[in-house]
Structure formats: C-alpha cells, structure tokens
Design a protein with these regions (language model features):
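TRNA-recognition modules of translation machinery and tRNA-sensing kinases, especially anticodon-binding
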Residues: 4-270
Length: 270
C-alpha cells in the first residue's frame, strides 16, 4: 500500500559521515554526501583526569621555593645505618637523647658493610675523647657493631651528615625533603611515616643571625606566616639551637621546625 511504501522509504537507512577529513577535501569525495548533524545539547563524555595529591603538591612547591633561593637538593636512601643516622651527629650510643628516635630496625640484613675511613675513626674518637674538636667527648668505648645496625631513616639530618662527608661546596646551600620513619603513637601531630624538610648552609661568613634570617624567610615564603617567634631549644648535634614557631589563624602558635649551628664534634670528623 501507499502507507507501507511511505514507511519503508522513511525508514531506509542513509549513510552519514561524522567527520570531514583532509583527504576528503583533497579528493572531493565529500561532495554529495550526507553529514551527521551535531547536537550541541548532548552532554560531553565525562573526563576524570589524574590529579596530584595535595600533600605531594605542597612538597613540590617547597622544593621549588628552595631551588629559587639557591639551594641544591640532597638525596639519600630510606635505609641507613646507625652511624650516619645518629653517631655521625654526635648522638652517643647510650644517651637518653637517642631515645627521641624510636626506630624501625631492618631484620635482614641486620648490619651494613664496614664504615668508611677516616670517618669511622674520627667519629669514634670524637665520642670517646673529643678527638681534634676541643671537646672532652662522651668518655665511652664506641661500639662499631652497633653503629653498623641497619634501620629505616629516622631523621633527615642523616642526609646532611652524608653531604658534609662528601666534600660539599663551600660556600654552599643544600636541602632535602627526606622521608623518615619512627615508631610513634599515631595522633593528630605524629605519624610513623612522614617527610622532614632539611637544609644546611655552609660558609665562612655566616653566623646565628644568618640562620635566624633564613628561618624567617622560610616561614614567610613557605608557611605564609604572619607572626613568627624563636624559642631556645636543645638538639644533640647543634649549639646554639632554636625552634621556629608560627601563629596559625585557627590553631594558634605551633612549632614549624628546629635548627641550630652544627657542633664542632659533628663538622670536624666529617
């Protein structure tokens, strides 16, 4: 019937082209073709791109700031021996100061290779009698087997110790964003796995005032702090030592970091 014929004619499939290509323009094959109409009302396919973790983005920004201030990046392994993590920093093997760092020890292998000379002898002498540092030392016999015990790095200063022993440039400025591990009770301000920002400045014409100025710059540029204050502190490997505190608009005063001038017992043996 006429109705059936009309329905069949209307439903007959028509070839449509969805995309006009350069080749079609070149050979003229587009002429006489039917092109699919665009429906601008259709929603586009949803794209779910990957994004940086906010904390990773913050660490990248910190790295950028340090490089912009003329610092060179230091690197080190996640697994370290007690010698570079503590002994080289004049932390005695028996002292309560060492208990600050409740660490994770490596089960296998439990110990590192022999400690490199002359650092082994120099650090051992500094602990026993002060060596060439002018100090009286800690007056105990250094246990080299304890110094070789492997552990997960508990502080970023271990990276600085290895840098000092590696003939760094003087004057020079170095930094690291070191992943550290401690056997902590996890709470709002403590974690067992964290990143520690570390920096050292080497030179003949720098002093404690230079350090305070750099800490203030750090607080302003990286923490965007409006109010800062310095408080006296104690660290086994620096003297004098200082804590940097900043005022958070909601949390109030909080510690941003600790710093100090490396003791001769640290710098001279290295």
């Amino acid at each position: 019937t006429n109705i059936h014929t009309a329905v069949l004619q209307k439903g007959r499939p028509v070839e449509e082209i969805s995309q006009l290509t350069p080749q079609m323009l070149k050979d003229g094959s587009w002429e006489g073709k039917s092109f699919r109409k665009y429906n601008i009302g259709l929603p586009p396919p949803r794209i779910t791109p990957g994004r940086k973790h906010p904390y990773k983005e913050f660490l990248d920004n910190v790295k950028y700031k340090f490089v912009a201030m003329g610092f060179e990046e230091m690197r080190g392994g996640l697994v370290e021996n007690e010698f570079w993590n503590m002994d080289a920093l004049y932390m005695p093997q028996f002292h309560p100061a060492r208990d600050i760092h409740d660490v994770y020890y490596v089960k296998e292998p439990a110990s590192s290779k022999e400690i490199e000379e002359p650092f082994r002898t120099r650090v051992s002498d500094a602990h026993y009698s002060g060596g060439d540092t002018g100090s009286r030392g800690w007056k105990y016999h250094f246990d080299i087997e304890k110094a070789k015990r492997l552990m997960l790095r508990s502080q970023g200063t271990a990276v600085s110790a290895r840098t000092l022993a590696g003939n760094p440039k003087i004057p020079g400025k170095y930094f690291s964003i070191a992943r550290c591990f401690r056997y902590e009770q996890v709470d709002a301000t403590h974690a067992q796995d964290f990143f520690q920002i570390e920096g050292i400045v080497l030179g003949d014409d720098i002093n404690f005032r230079t350090l305070l100025g750099l800490l203030e710059l750090f607080a302003l540029e990286i923490a965007k702090a409006k109010e800062i204050e310095f408080l006296p502190a104690y660290f086994p490997f620096t003297e004098p030592s200082v804590e940097l505190h900043v005022k958070h608009p909601k949390l109030g005063w909080m510690e941003l970091g600790g710093a100090g001038i490396f003791r001769p017992e640290v710098t001279i043996p290295l």
